[in-house]
Amino acid sequence: MEFSEWYSDILEKAGIYDLRYPIKGCGVYLPYGFKIRRYSFEILRKLLDETNHDETLFPMLIPENLLAKEGEHIKGFEDEVFWVTHGGKTPLEVKLALRPTSETTMYYMMKQWIKVHTDLPMKLYQVVNTFRYETKHTRPLIRLREIMSFKEAHTAHATKEDCDAQITEALNLYGEFFDEICVPYIISKRPEWDKFPGADYTMAFDTIYPDGKTMQIGTVHNLGQNFAKTFELEFETPDGEKDFVYQTCYGISDRAIASLISVHGDEKGLVIPVDVAPIQIVLIPLLFKGKEEIVMDKIKELNNTLKSEFRVHLDDRDIRPGRKYNDWEIKGVPLRIELGPRDIENGQALIVRRDTGEKITVEYSNILEEVEKIVSMYKENLKIKADEKIKNFLTVVNFESDVNALSEKVKAALLENKGIILIPFDESVYNEEFEELIDASVLGQTAYEGKDYISVARTY
């Protein structure tokens, strides 16, 4: 099955997301998928809170005249803005945009709050819906008209040095987040022609899907003083002078959820990282005539033992065990524990890992400790597999001074190996003309094994 078909199929079968809402590019998070989203963003919120970011919430509606202040930035997506033009039947004097991103709203308010250097740094974030009128082919959780989970952080600083340090912190924070949800990545400095409009520079996280295409999953932007000058974000320095703040912003969206689904899934269904799994352990009673009560009493006892540390579900549906195995494999539940009369007689239980399919018989009397060990191995294995997957999709090609020869070499590598092609960095081919020659995207300048490369790939 092709990846695109598998992806659409698994979103429905595993109860992640329903596309049948009657607006293109808009869908519904189903309960199971929403829990994956919730647990994922809980990790992200914790990382932000621990680094002194404050969560807030800004309006969705932006007056047209305020949005227009963004100048160069708004040109990057002015054709994608949704507009509210009426209140009831009455035309509005000023059109209102549905939030495409929040620089305008947040910086307008920051101007009200930042007066002196002691007000800095200011580090705010929110998790909100944003809207883009996507005209390309929409894909659930990947390319949407309503992005339902956009975490955007915006910071303001008194000095360039503090601003640069914030970029480093943001990169480390995002790296830790993607490590926690077992999504592999490379980090690139985007080329000038593909940076965030209005930014000094953009750093981006990309992962690779099973079809060899890359997906941008996170961005970090150094805005310098560009937006501060537009929005008159001034403060009084310690020596009484006036200066503009230095700013950063960085975002992660539903693509993080799409990626953790896509990277580890297999022909059976999802393989969910433990920390974000809605159900971490499913219990399957193996019932035999005359032994039902014994088994159910024991498995309920096991449920009570495990649920103190894990999210556990006891599947007591009146259907065959094989059907239950299939259902929970589709949903990617990390561990399955089977318990039948013979297991009880032998003082044992059978644990099955979703990531490897390995079946492990453990002593029932020591089951909590055994589960803890297996969960730890599961987490470590997913991280190792994630790193292996991205390394298998990286190909280094030798540099050619002949641009046409180099472009043919890159195209051949993309065709044969897919994934990301790394070219030793050289300014002579770091341009849009070369990007057109190779008929692929230049991701940017990427450090790999101590050297600088130009990374190129087919992208979503």
From Swiss-Prot:
**Record-linked InterPro entries:** aa-tRNA-synt_IIb, aa-tRNA-synth_II, aa-tRNA-synth_II/BPL/LPL, Anticodon-bd, Anticodon-bd_dom_sf, Pro-tRNA-ligase_IIa, Pro-tRNA-ligase_IIa_arc-type, Pro-tRNA_synth_II
Instruction: Write out the coiled-coil annotation as residue ranges.
Output: none
Kindly list the places in or outside the cell where this protein is found, as annotated in its UniProt entry: Cytoplasm
Cystine pairings recorded for this chain: none
Q: Which Pfam families match?
A: HGTP_anticodon (PF03129), ProRS-C_2 (PF09181), tRNA-synt_2b (PF00587)
Q: What is its EC number?
A: 6.1.1.15
Q: Which CDD domains match?
A: ProRS_core_arch_euk (cd00778)
Q: Name one GO molecular function term.
A: ATP binding
Keyword Zinc-finger among UniProt keywords: no
This protein's UniProt keywords: Aminoacyl-tRNA synthetase, ATP-binding, Cytoplasm, Ligase, Nucleotide-binding, Protein biosynthesis
Top-level taxon in the UniProt lineage:
Archaea
The protein's enzyme class:
ligase
Family that this chain belongs to: Belongs to the class-II aminoacyl-tRNA synthetase family. ProS type 3 subfamily.
> What remark about domains does the record contain?
Consists of three domains: the N-terminal catalytic domain, the anticodon-binding domain and the C-terminal extension.
In its UniProt entry, what is this protein called? Answer: Proline--tRNA ligase
- Organism field: Methanococcus maripaludis (strain C5 / ATCC BAA-1333)
Lineage of origin: Archaea, Methanobacteriati, Methanobacteriota, Methanomada group, Methanococci
Gene (name only)? proS
